[in-house]
Amino acid sequence: MRHQTKKHTLGKAQDQRKALLRSLATELFTYGEIKTTMARAKALRPYAEGIITLAKKGDLNSRRQAAKFIFDKETGKFFDPETSKVYETAEEGKKLVSQTVLRKLFSTISKEYSERNGGYTRIFRLPPRRGDATDMALIQLV
């Protein structure tokens, strides 16, 4: 029996669902907001909020746990680990490393939500998608 098992299956197998949520979470943390279907947005919300909660802890184990849940791709910006500043281009004379989604999550996003106890994302309804009339949504970091 499946009593009290609450998750959105999205009509996909478990491995496909995990890959989809990882991809959506990575894009959400990269751009701050994404446009997707309502069902995917509702499935992404608890997934992304759990990752932000891990980032707020900030220890090594939390970093390793969060690395399992997102793709650690580069964002195209540069990061100064000493001052935690983000630069658009590499500057001369500074030790800059390329900013990845995981670094952005633990350095920038976790500090923004340090005083907040949940509710890190919001979902806006959008007009239905043209073609198949699927309910669309905009999910963004608060």
Language model feature labels by segment:
Residues 2-9, 24-142:
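Structured, basic alpha/beta domains of bacterial-type, RNA-associated proteins
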Residues 12-16:
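Short alpha-helix boundary/capping segments
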Residues 20:
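Basic, ligand-binding patches in group-transfer machinery
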